[in-house]
């Protein structure tokens, strides 16, 4: 079976936004206008197609990235059918990992902003992630029908707060109750969508007289932005010649794909206005897979030779697994993006990250949580596979005879932990299975057993993240559990360098004995740097090379549970430079135990300290409550970094220890009568104050 849509007519896009910007509603309208949904699903009645988890429908927020495929031929049927693969991503900061991993496999993004709230805290986080992966993007200013909507104010915020170069393609005609359509700044025509058929059809009209001057000004801005990096067009423009519509669009597209400009459209998804023109902009100004740079990777060889794959069906197969999801009927679904080549159901491929073979049982195209089985997928496709046994997020799947490892995704370390205990014996068996499955799905969620208390500890990116995990355990796996109080993920490190630390493990009392002897040096590393560095400085074979890895392993085991208070040890270097061995009695175990003993001894001499996680907190509050909010942040050991003035509210930026932020959402609501909002993300680890450290260490010793 050959490809039905040429790769030049593919668009792999993500839809991203701050919570409550109307992103899921925008996606629902896209699905309606492209013909997949015959009835529009609304978020506020829990019927949205892309929000298919029960928790999402209850809370009205998007938690996981649902993927769907649809087709669009243009508002006026002016294009050949284009295939749009859409990833809908969450807007809550606890689910940033979902945004991160979808950005990794996308070619373009649509950023949705609220015409009232504008650029909000999470918008900046998502923008940084798009910058990191160099994703071209267009913006959609939504909710133009809401009280306080102001399109040009949001355009200005995109410029100032995100450091972008925004170029509006449209102007809003009216705002709030009087929002009726948009001015197309390329055609210089007013566009009105008909209410009688939910905006499926539209008409071009003359620009309202009161908007002619403003439209001319922004049309000139658009044309100047288009010709700026095209000498031929610039000369034509300066000579006073009229530029054609296709010349303007082609020049804008080139600059948008190079991330030099961000094109902006507007509308009201809820009122069925503007999403249709947004779809046209996706086709005209976002890249096809063959517009973007070739994907980089390394060959699966000793030298790790750099290699590339281009978006071509004839190239060797390569794909990236970007999400694992559990399905109640078929088990694990592995979402993957094909970068090159073709794969059919039944094919055996190579998982180069784990150096093992995998067989594609079945391949399905996803539409939210509905599946359509397909026989094969091509370069540029996003699909899900059933039957892959040992694939995890970030693994590369490739041709058996032409292996490559594509650049892996980076996942943040969890910052908050809670203990979970099953209520019954039956729950205990099911809980292990449930947590294993959930950890496989979500790389920012971790599970471990506390060595001292034997409790199961789960860790994640925030309180809401762990709440959802516990909720899913109950709903999807019928596991009832008692949940402990949130715990902070502290770390341990050292401040001083110490030398001549001796570790011995010697037992020689007849028969085969044990002999391991090491001398090491401990030294601090740059904070947030390499984490752990092992230097083998053994000269003259005083310790045989076969025991070196056992010494390294013995130290690494101690890093998991630090000598100070049992927290992981970070930013520490170990230099092994002397020791001795016995021809008969030395063993890997003896050297491992000797290294562990030396590390424990040296750590206590090297001025050990406790590190606490510091969060970057951004609070948006009405002016009236600013004093209360700042006072409360100060009481929480927060440091106010700065403030920004919005028209009706203030933004407060602060750095606050995570341990002081538990329950903050409730406190902020009561302080501001529910009118303030905040976002919080991990910033860095710093030394915890003496009194805090003392309390924690004493509690751990009891």
Swiss-Prot record:
Domain tr-type G: 8-290
Chief place where the protein resides: cytoplasm
Protein origin, superkingdom: Bacteria
Coiled coil: none
Record GO cellular component, one term: cytoplasm
Keywords (A to Z) from UniProt: Cytoplasm, Elongation factor, GTP-binding, Nucleotide-binding, Protein biosynthesis
Positions of GTP binding: 17-24, 88-92, 142-145
Any one Gene Ontology molecular-function term assigned to this protein's record: GTPase activity
Cell compartment(s), UniProt: Cytoplasm
GO BP field: ribosome disassembly
InterPro entries on file: EFG_II, EFG_III, EFG_III/V, EFG_IV, EFG_V, EFG_V-like, EFTu-like_2, G_TR_CS
Record SMART domains: EFG_C, EFG_IV
Cross-referenced Pfam families: EFG_C (PF00679), EFG_III (PF14492), EFG_IV (PF03764), GTP_EFTU (PF00009), GTP_EFTU_D2 (PF03144)
Gene3D superfamilies: 3.30.230.10, 3.30.70.240, Elongation Factor G (Translational Gtpase), domain 3 (3.30.70.870), P-loop containing nucleotide triphosphate hydrolases (3.40.50.300), Translation factors (2.40.30.10)
Protein purpose: Catalyzes the GTP-dependent ribosomal translocation step during translation elongation. During this step, the ribosome changes from the pre-translocational (PRE) to the post-translocational (POST) state as the newly formed A-site-bound peptidyl-tRNA and P-site-bound deacylated tRNA move to the P and E sites, respectively. Catalyzes the coordinated movement of the two tRNA molecules, the mRNA and conformational changes in the ribosome.
NCBIfam families to which the protein is assigned, alphabetical: EF-G, PRK12740.1-5, small_GTP
Family statement drawn from the similarity comment of this UniProt entry: Belongs to the TRAFAC class translation factor GTPase superfamily. Classic translation factor GTPase family. EF-G/EF-2 subfamily.
Protein name listed in UniProt: Elongation factor G
Gene: fusA
């Amino acid at each position: 079976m050959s490809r039905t849509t040429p790769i030049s007519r593919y668009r792999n896009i993500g839809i991203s936004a701050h919570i409550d910007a109307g992103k899921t509603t925008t996606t629902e309208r896209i699905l309606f206008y492209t013909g997949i949904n015959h009835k529009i699903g609304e978020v506020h009645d829990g019927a949205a197609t892309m929000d298919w988890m029960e928790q999402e429908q209850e809370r009205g927020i998007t938690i996981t990235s649902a993927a769907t495929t649809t087709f669009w031929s243009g508002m006026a049927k002016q294009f050949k059918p284009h295939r749009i693969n859409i990833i809908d991503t969450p807007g809550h900061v606890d689910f940033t990992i979902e945004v991160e991993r979808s950005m990794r496999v996308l070619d373009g993004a649509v950023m949705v902003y609220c015409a009232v709230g504008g650029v909000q805290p999470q918008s900046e986080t998502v923008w940084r992630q798009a910058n990191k992966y160099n994703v071209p993007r267009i913006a959609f200013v939504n909710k133009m029908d809401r009280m306080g909507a102001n399109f040009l104010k949001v355009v200005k915020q995109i410029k100032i707060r995100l450091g972008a170069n925004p170029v509006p393609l449209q102007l809003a005609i009216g705002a709030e109750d009087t929002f009726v359509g948009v001015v197309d700044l390329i055609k210089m025509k007013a566009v009105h969508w008909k209410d009688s058929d939910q905006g499926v059809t539209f008409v071009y009209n003359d620009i309202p007289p009161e908007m002619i001057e403003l439209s001319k000004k922004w049309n000139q801005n658009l044309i100047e932005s288009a010709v700026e990096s095209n000498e031929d067009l610039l000369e034509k423009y300066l000579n006073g010649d009229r530029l054609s519509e296709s010349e303007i669009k082609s020049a804008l597209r080139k600059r948008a794909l190079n991330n030099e400009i961000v094109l902006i459209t507007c509308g009201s998804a809820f009122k069925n206005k503007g999403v249709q023109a947004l779809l046209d902009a996706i086709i005209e100004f976002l890249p096809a897979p063959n517009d973007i740079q070739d994907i980089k990777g390394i060959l699966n060889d000793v030298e790790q030779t750099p290699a590339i794959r281009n978006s071509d069906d004839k190239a060797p197969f390569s794909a990236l697994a970007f999400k694992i999801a559990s399905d109640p009927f078929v088990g694990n679904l592995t979402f993957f993006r094909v970068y090159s080549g073709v794969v059919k159901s039944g094919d055996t491929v190579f998982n180069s990250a784990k150096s093992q073979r995998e067989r594609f049982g079945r391949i399905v195209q996803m539409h939210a949580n509905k599946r359509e089985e397909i026989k094969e997928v091509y370069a540029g496709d996003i699909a899900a596979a059933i039957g892959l046994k040992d694939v995890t997020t970030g693994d590369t799947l490739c041709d058996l005879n032409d292996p490559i490892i594509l650049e892996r995704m980076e996942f943040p370390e969890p910052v908050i932990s809670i203990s979970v205990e099953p209520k019954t014996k039956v729950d205990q068996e099911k809980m292990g299975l449930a947590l294993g499955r959930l950890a496989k799905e979500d790389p920012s969620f971790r599970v471990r057993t506390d060595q001292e208390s034997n409790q199961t500890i789960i860790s994640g990116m925030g309180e809401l993240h762990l709440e959802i995990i516990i909720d899913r355990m109950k709903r999807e796996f019928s596991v009832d559990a008692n949940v402990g109080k949130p715990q902070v993920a502290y770390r341990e490190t050292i401040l001083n360098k110490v030398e001549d630390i001796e570790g011995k493990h010697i037992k020689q009392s007849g028969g085969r004995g044990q002999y391991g002897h090491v001398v090491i040096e401990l030294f601090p590393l740059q904070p947030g740097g390499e984490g752990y560095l092992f230097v083998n400085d053994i000269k003259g074979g005083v310790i045989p090379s076969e025991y070196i890895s056992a010494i390294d392993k013995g130290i690494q085991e101690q890093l998991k549970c630090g000598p100070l208070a049992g927290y992981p040890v970070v930013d520490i270097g170990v230099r092994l430079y002397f020791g001795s061995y016995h021809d008969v009695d030395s063993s890997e175990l003896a050297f491992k135990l000797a290294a562990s003993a030396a590390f424990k001894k040296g750590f206590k001499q090297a001025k050990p300290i406790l590190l606490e996680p510091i969060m970057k907190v951004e609070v948006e509050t009405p002016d009236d409550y600013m004093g209360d909010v700042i006072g409360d942040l100060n009481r929480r050991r927060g440091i106010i970094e700065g403030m920004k003035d919005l028209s009706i509210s203030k933004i407060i930026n602060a750095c606050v220890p995570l341990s002081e932020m538990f329950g903050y959402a409730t406190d902020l609501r009561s302080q501001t009568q529910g009118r303030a909002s905040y976002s919080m993300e991990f910033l860095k680890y710093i030394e915890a104050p003496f009194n805090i450290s003392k309390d924690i260490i004493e509690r751990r010793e009891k």
